[in-house]
């Protein structure tokens, strides 16, 4: 009976996660549609989409894969062999390291924003390039919240909590949609860029009470010369390279799209629709 109850719980959790993911993608499509509805499919929308992908792409290339591929396995290994206290010490060092790395990325990204825009969209007009560079500088701080949110999601999943991580994207998408409806015409594309940072910070903030629920109490720890940190970095090396495919694909897409006016916006929306269709058809196939 106990096994059956556990199986039912897993099934409900999987169903909830699938629905939350699908709903989040649908809201993402609504969010992107509102972008073109309020700002058109031209200078502002292209510049915004380029600027919003630069920080996340850089994050994915540098440390995105480390969290899922190396941090969580090492954390789980410490939990099983050394206990929770030792695992929490590792968490403190890792989170401190993530904050330091993401701060470095933010500062470097803001300083070299023009170079990054040229890499991502080399064929933009001067006006579109300048706007994209300005918006990139505004949105780079979201890398910090991205790193923290990814880390906390991994921790919660290690503790067996999957429902809360699956809804955080819903909250951020709703926050952006709310901006369009209430403030879109008043604060324009610059306000939208600030809202993107706020939306990512909300993902991080929502996770804090749940992290505390499982006994995680963060204390800054700069002792990075730690065998577990070294183990994590050695494990991350080969895996990190494999995570570069999607970010590099995104860069190549935008480089080609920057040749054509509004193409960046159209590609973003078509990719979003493709992902929704893929999720829907894969779920339907699972039912057969």
Regions found by a protein language model. Give the residues of each.
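Hydrophobic alpha-helical transmembrane segments
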Residues: 168-178, 187-213
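Alpha-helical transmembrane segments of multi-pass membrane proteins
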Residues: 125-151
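Short membrane-interface helical motifs at transmembrane helix boundaries
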Residues: 105-126
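Interhelical loop/hinge segments that connect adjacent transmembrane helices in multipass membrane
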Residues: 1-10, 208-246
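Alpha-helical transmembrane segments of multi-pass membrane transporters/permeases
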Residues: 141, 152-178
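Single conserved hydrophobic/aromatic residue that forms the stacking wall/gate
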Residues: 280-288
